[in-house]
């Protein structure tokens, strides 16, 4: 039996004595897309930050490629992290931004231009290579954000609400990028509020509430249960008193950039 690329077992986390994650189990295989669904404060972002190696669980384990991403640098480098916020330098061009991330990923000067070109081709942004990121639309910036996460040639890409606030054209472009990544065997974990998006993209979905995964399976099965009113009762009972601070409070741009860049170092 092939070991899954990502295995989370009994993961628990608390902030300021408030439970954020509670005994979470999750697996994700290569070339698979898993959608994390649930309301604000359900624990989606916190779980993704655990998997990205930004946080360590207070109980349980997180493994990516059999290694602990919080403690093992090589494991973190196998992960592409795309936060909700734009983690780019607005005054630098698209190519210059990607060059910074390529350097952080340890790519040598001679290979850097090729790595940047490959990431731009995969995300279909080569036409904007010489334009400052700050002059691009929000949807285009999100594609540059995804391209930046690919500099480490990750086996796993984590995306937190990648299509939030973008128009239908930009949404379709981002969906196309994710489809190409899956074809290359990349594992993808995407947090979203949009059931239609999850149904279109994901092989499986996990519905979170109150720091727990309360439903997991195919979207068809989950939607059938929703129509029958089954999960609502459980979700209502397990919703937290308020959203987790790290999931709703906007963070300074420099803080987000530093967090993303840390994963590539």
Describe these PLM feature segments.
Residues 37-39:
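The feature captures the beta-strand-to-loop junction immediately N-terminal to the Walker
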Residues 52:
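Helix-to-loop junction immediately C-terminal to a conserved catalytic motif
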Residues 60-70, 75:
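Conserved ABC transporter NBD signature motif
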Residues 99, 103, 110-128:
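Conserved ABC ATPase "signature" region
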Residues 157-160:
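Catalytic Walker B motif of ABC-type/P-loop ATPase nucleotide-binding domains
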Residues 216-217:
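ABC ATPase "signature
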């Amino acid at each position: 039996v092939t070991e899954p690329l990502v295995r989370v077992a009994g993961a628990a986390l608390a902030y300021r004595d408030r439970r954020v994650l509670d005994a979470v189990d999750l697996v994700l295989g290569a070339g698979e897309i898993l959608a994390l669904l649930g309301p604000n404060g359900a624990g989606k972002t916190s779980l993704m930050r655990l998997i990205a190696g930004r946080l360590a669980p207070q109980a349980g384990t997180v493994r990516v490629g059999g290694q602990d991403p919080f403690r093992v640098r090589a494991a973190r480098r196998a992960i592409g992290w795309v936060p909700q916020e734009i983690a780019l330098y607005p005054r630098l061009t698209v190519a210059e931004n990607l060059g910074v991330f390529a350097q952080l990923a340890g790519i040598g000067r001679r290979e850097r231009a090729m790595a940047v070109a490959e990431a731009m081709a995969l995300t279909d942004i080569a036409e904007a290579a010489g334009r400052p990121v700050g002059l691009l639309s929000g949807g285009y910036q999100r594609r540059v954000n995804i391209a930046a996460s690919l500099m480490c040639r990750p086996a796993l890409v984590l995306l937190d609400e990648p299509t939030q606030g973008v128009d239908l054209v930009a949404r379709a472009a981002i969906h196309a990028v994710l489809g190409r990544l899956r074809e290359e065997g990349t594992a993808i974990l995407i947090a979203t509020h949009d059931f239609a998006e999850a149904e279109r993209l994901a092989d499986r979905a996990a519905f979170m509430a109150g720091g727990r995964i309360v439903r997991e399976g195919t979207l068809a099965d989950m939607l059938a249960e929703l129509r029958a009113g089954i999960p609502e009762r459980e979700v209502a009972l397990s919703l937290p008193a308020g959203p987790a601070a790290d999931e709703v409070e906007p963070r300074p741009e420099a803080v987000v950039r530093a967090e993303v860049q840390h994963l590539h170092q």
